[in-house]
A protein has these predicted regions:
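Structural register within alpha-helical repeat arrays
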Residues: 193, 227, 261, 295-298, ...
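Terminal, low-structured helical/coil segments at or just beyond the last alpha-helical repeat
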Residues: 301, 318-369
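Short pre-active-site segment immediately N-terminal to the catalytic Zn-binding motif
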Residues: 1-9, 76-79
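Canonical positions in the second alpha-helix
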Residues: 179, 212-213, 246-247, 280-281, ...
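Catalytic Zn2+-binding segment of zinc metalloproteases
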Residues: 2-5, 15-32, 50
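Extracytoplasmic and endomembrane cell-envelope/extracellular-matrix remodeling and assembly machinery
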Residues: 70-243, 253, 272, 321, ...
Length: 369
């Protein structure tokens, strides 16, 4: 994407797939089509047998039936894509973005594809980025007020971060050498150069770049996170922790800042503070699996083995492994020095998971009978 509106168009398109229940509709359509396809193939076999068992004729009939089935699936998927375009453009306009951004993004995708897919007919492509699709997107966008595409500071910084994460080290060094010698380089390029210095293990130099950026742009969490991380990596731990603490005072419960602050506290031997910080985050914002695992690690380093096992149980639940979750809860219940509240909480969670597993087994048994 070249701007924030184009990025938003991708999200709007995918959101439309969800709101229009395309996955559920596709599963239902495939189940119905499977029966039709099976019946068609069976009919082809019977007709071939009745005609004297001509093997070539039967093979041709079966291939035709299978081809028709595949084409119907492609048509259904293609219709979903066009519907997601139409609904997504409405989302895009309602959110204040440029409704033409989706068509612009399609054109950029088409240029990127080049000749790679030129041999595939449009009717056989389930995600056709063609003139027809672009034209339909532009016609749909014309129904809404046109807005100018903008690019926020956050978007520009994220692009630099992604560039650093995906570009080989030697290429990054060449890319940012010229930028570093320029007079008053752009914020995003300076940020990218600082991230590059961190990637090649020169964090102290990154700190010198990031400190003035933070002072000039105090409302940007990405800059605070990068500065705090650079300070920690440069063994300026007191300064790094102070940076994170100040940032969280400005942006309470910001997840990336909280995670990096917790990691900094753990590296500084302040596990109990990290544990408290992560528990507050866990209880107020839907956690990610890595975040839950870090919470368990903080509990372990803080000497709370019961909570360490408990949050490892939650980590396994987040990954869909309920058997391992049960094992961790059993270990939690056998941990020393548990409070009454901890015992009751661990047991309640264990009972909940066991009840769920028992119900799931009963449902599988009844469905197999």
């Amino acid at each position: 994407s070249q701007n924030e509106s184009e990025l938003a168009s991708v999200l709007a398109h995918e959101t439309a797939h969800v709101t229009q229940r395309h996955i559920a509709r596709e599963i239902n359509a495939q189940s119905k089509q499977g029966l039709v396809s099976a019946a068609t193939i069976l009919a082809a076999i019977l007709i071939g047998a009745a005609a004297g068992g001509n093997g070539s004729a039967m093979e041709g009939a079966i291939a035709a039936a299978q081809g028709a089935s595949i084409q119907q699936q492609i048509n259904f998927t293609r219709a979903q894509e066009y519907e997601a375009d139409r609904v997504g453009i409405g989302f895009l306009a309602s959110a204040g973005f440029d409704p033409n951004a989706m068509a612009n993004f399609f054109e950029a995708m088409s240029r990127q594809e080049g000749l790679n897919g030129a041999w595939i007919p449009e009717m056989l492509r389930d995600h056709p980025v063609t003139g027809n699709r672009v034209a339909e997107a532009r016609a749909r966008a014309a129904q809404y007020e046109r807005r100018k595409s903008s690019q926020s500071v956050g978007y520009a910084l994220i692009k630099e971060r992604l560039r650093v994460l995906t570009t080989p080290r030697e290429e990054l060094l060449h890319l940012y050498t010229e930028i570093g010698s320029a007079h008053e380089p752009e914020l995003d390029k300076n940020y990218g150069r600082a991230l590059t210095l961190m990637a090649i293990e020169r964090p102290a130099e990154a700190v010198k770049i990031l400190q003035p950026l933070v002072e000039r742009h105090q409302g940007n969490t990405l800059l605070y996170a990068a500065l705090g991380q650079a300070q920690m990596e440069a063994q300026q731990k007191a300064e790094g922790l102070a940076t994170f603490e100040h940032a969280l005072a400005l942006f309470p419960r910001n997840v990336p800042l909280s995670i990096r602050y917790a990691e900094g506290l753990l590296s500084a031997g302040r596990a109990q503070e990290a544990h408290v910080l992560l528990l507050d985050l866990f209880n107020n914002i839907e956690p990610t699996p890595p975040q839950i695992r870090l919470t368990a690690a903080a509990a372990s380093q803080a000497g709370d083995s019961g909570d360490a096992y408990y949050y490892m149980s939650e980590y396994h639940i987040s990954n869909g492994d309920l058997a391992l979750s049960v094992q961790q809860l059993q270990l939690a219940l056998n941990a020393p020095n548990l409070t009454v509240v901890q015992k009751e909480r661990y047991q309640a969670r264990l009972d909940e998971i066991r009840d769920y597993l028992a119900t799931a087994r009963m449902q599988r048994t009844s469905s197999n009978q």
